[in-house]
């Protein structure tokens, strides 16, 4: 980005640098025409929103803009919601998805995730919570509008999805550092950018990015994805038609959890929603403590 949004990001980064213990950095001068040669801009003359996450600290008021933006974007999608994320472990985000799945004419929701989180601890925290949430969402998906997929190479090797992207219809494009898990949306320091289409050119650009991402995952040309979406009106049907042998997207399969893994997931032991919950008793919190209130007692 360049222009006023770049200046705003610079101010944000300088402040965070000092909060992290760095020495103050002087503000640079605004340069004109600093866009790299040979790099075509996807969008020009658009308003860019900045959403932040900053945890509560003794000298800092918490900021949960990134989470609030996720919830608003999920609630506002009309036909299609496309998400790429390293994790899917936030109860609040899952609840927002569940509300859309309950609607008779809600949007399709496609989530791209890695097969498993990296490291030895993150799979225990993230994969188990994802399994519990996807199981619960599957029970709510009576209209069959939710799918999760994993990207794979032509040789069948899983590709680790590290992206943080949300595209709602051809109207909203969001990217940044926020993952769909409690730690990212409540405890970490994050920053996301988002644009909303206010003209046909911007809407076409947003759709082109979505179609290009799907084409990359499916090993086909973007024009094939665009044409198939136009024919079917469905992201899910498009993926199902185009995925096959070679580079492709494979559906998520809910794993069987051990009793310990299920307990860890249900109690959010390794992915608390805030500093206070790191020390809160397990009886007062858990993955589904508000889920049942949302369901209104439905089985």
Regions found by a protein language model. Give the residues of each.
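Charged, low-complexity intrinsically disordered terminal segments
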Residues: 1-299
């Amino acid at each position: 980005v360049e222009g006023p949004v770049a200046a705003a990001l610079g101010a944000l980064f300088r402040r965070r640098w000092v909060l992290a213990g760095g020495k103050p950095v002087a503000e640079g001068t605004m340069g004109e025409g600093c866009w790299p040669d040979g790099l075509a801009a996807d969008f020009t003359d658009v308003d860019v929103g900045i959403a932040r996450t900053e945890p509560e600290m003794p000298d800092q008021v918490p900021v949960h803009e990134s989470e609030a933006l996720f919830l608003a974007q999920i609630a506002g999608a009309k036909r299609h919601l496309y998400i790429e994320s390293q994790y899917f472990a936030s109860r609040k985000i899952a609840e927002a998805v569940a509300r859309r799945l309950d609607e008779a004419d809600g949007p399709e929701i496609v989530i791209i995730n890695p097969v498993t989180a990296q490291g030895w601890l993150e799979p225990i925290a993230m994969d188990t919570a994802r399994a519990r949430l996807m199981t619960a969402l599957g029970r709510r998906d009576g209209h069959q509008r939710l799918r999760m997929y994993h990207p794979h190479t032509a040789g069948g090797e899983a590709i680790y999805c590290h992206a943080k992207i949300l595209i709602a219809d051809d109207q909203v494009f969001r990217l940044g550092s926020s993952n769909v898990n409690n730690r990212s949306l409540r405890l970490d320091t994050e920053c996301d950018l988002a644009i909303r289409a206010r003209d046909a050119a911007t809407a076409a650009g947003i759709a082109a990015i979505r179609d290009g991402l799907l084409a990359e995952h499916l090993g086909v040309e973007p024009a094939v994805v665009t044409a198939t979406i136009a024919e079917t009106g469905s992201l899910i049907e498009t993926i199902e038609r185009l995925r096959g042998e070679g580079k492709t997207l494979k559906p998520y399969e809910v794993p069987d959890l051990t009793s310990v893994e299920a307990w860890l997931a249900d109690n959010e032991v390794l992915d608390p929603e805030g500093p206070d919950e790191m020390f809160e008793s397990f009886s007062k919190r858990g993955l589904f403590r508000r889920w049942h209130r949302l369901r209104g007692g439905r089985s």
